[in-house]
Curated annotation (Swiss-Prot):
This is Deoxyuridine 5'-triphosphate nucleotidohydrolase. Keywords: Hydrolase, Magnesium, Metal-binding, Nucleotide metabolism. The keyword Lyase does not apply. InterPro entries: dUTPase, dUTPase-like, dUTPase-like_sf, dUTPase_trimeric. It holds the Pfam family dUTPase. GO terms for biological process: dUMP biosynthetic process; dUTP catabolic process. Its cofactor is Mg(2+). Belongs to the dUTPase family. It comes from Burkholderia lata (strain ATCC 17760 / DSM 23089 / LMG 22485 / NCIMB 9086 / R18194 / 383). It comes from the Bacteria. The keyword Nucleus does not apply. One of its GO terms (molecular function) is magnesium ion binding. Substrate binds at residues 67-69, 80, 84-86, 94. Pathway: Pyrimidine metabolism; dUMP biosynthesis; dUMP from dCTP (dUTP route): step 2/2.
């Protein structure tokens, strides 16, 4: 798949999104910052990437996901948990960054902060019904299938 990428900050030419390994599903996104930013515990900020994408095809979307090491080691996750980039969005990719840890965290310019994953999308059309065909589960919700 070819993906249109617009470089909004010339410094990002040296830090284009890349797959870390041949098996990677996510492209690393970096913080496009002029200076380090300190996030206090509980603080959230929007971090620019200096990049924009345009998927164009409504059969695809992009997800911005946290990097596992930052969340596990430092408590740095996404403020919106998952960022959804629709196929027709053309603005700068921004990363909502939340320090849920107990200590301050310093985010340095061009540090890898999140990952971008391209996923297929199916746009559903509703079929209005009075009742559903019966299933084994029915309307059983939270915990209805047992604990073990």
């Amino acid at each position: 798949m070819k993906l249109d990428l617009k470089i909004l900050d010339a410094r990002m030419r040296d830090y284009l999104p890349a797959y870390a390994t041949t098996g990677s599903a996510g492209l690393d996104l970096r913080a496009c910052l002029d200076a380090p930013v300190t996030l206090q515990p509980g603080e959230t900020t929007l971090v620019p990437t200096g990049l924009a994408i345009h998927l164009a095809d409504p059969g695809y979307a992009a997800l911005i996901l946290p990097r596992s090491g930052l969340g596990h080691k430092h408590g740095i996750v996404l403020g919106n948990l998952v960022g959804l980039i629709d196929s027709d969005y053309q603005g700068q990719l921004m990363i909502s960054t939340w320090n849920r840890g107990q200590t301050e965290f310093v985010l340095n310019p061009f540090e890898r902060l999140a990952q971008l994953v391209i996923v297929p999308v199916v746009q559903a059309q509703f079929n209005i019904v009075d009742d559903f065909a019966e299933s084994d589960r029915g309307d059983g919700g939270f915990g209805s299938t047992g604990r073990h």
